[in-house]
Amino acid sequence: MRVLFASLASVGHTYPLIPLAVAVREAGHEVHFAAGENVHASLHRNGLRPFRPADSFYEIYAEDLEPDLARLRPDLIVHEWGQSGPAIAAQRAGIPSLWHGFGRMFPDGIGLEKPTLDRPHLDTCPPSLQDKDFLATAERIELRPVAYSEPLPEWRVERTSRPLVYLTLGTAFGTAEVLTTAIQGLTAAGIDVVVAAGNVRLGAVPKDVTVHEWVPQAELLPYVDAVVHHGGSGTTLGALAVGVPQLVLPQGADQFANADALSVAGAALSILPGELSADSVAESVRKLLSPRGGHRDAARAIAEEIARMPSPGEVARDLPRWAENR
């Protein structure tokens, strides 16, 4: 079977698809991946045959992909739900296709077109956090979210007797002001901090803070006591999968909805932009780490739920039947 994956050309939209794409390749199928060149290096490293449709840079339009569909003649197309172009191209060509999610559906303010519900959806969100209307109306294929990150040479986590917290604002929402405020609050609470600052330059930081441009998030998460982040779906699901409580500092897109869902579930606390200060961060992280708050227990319960979801390997073995639905 020949399977074509497609995503927007960003880490947050491409990385969630890589575990399933790799599992499909390891199951003996031929895999190709349509995306802009920004993410080709990671796709090449995983043997996923990336290519850039036409002149597409970030988003892929149906007209960009149609010549490649004629060339490759895939049996199945799997595309993230932020990409409507591949869905349209697949429909025109009569090729079965599946939506691949990356979190809760359908978040307000994310700026993406909602997919139609007439085709199956690979759902990586644990049911307890998923939108109840979506659960009731969509044809879902449960898929365990598996964190993917690029390995870094000589990476290691050093623990002390103090709590360790991972701080990130993702690839698109980082600002020096928010990161600095969070660092001030975390260090005031007596916490060691690992920061993934992206392209933000922070200058001098306290001795108990380690700043990196990027970290191998999937390798780091099992070792931390809490995650302080923007509420992006990748970090949210990655932390939940290992049972780590979260402090969410939402900045935009789907992050406010994620913060609300996590707070209701008891696995997180959140601080809105207008309420963010070093004091509010320190107070919140103390509550988060306190056994009396129950946040770790709630996060671990969701981790157990995620562990029961079908793995990428299990889902990959079942994909051929969806290709037969022509």
For each feature predicted by the language model, list its residue ranges.
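Glycosyltransferase specificity loop/lid
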Residues: 1-104, 177, 181, 187-326
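A nucleotide-sugar donor-handling region in carbohydrate enzymes
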Residues: 36, 40, 109-164, 168-173, ...
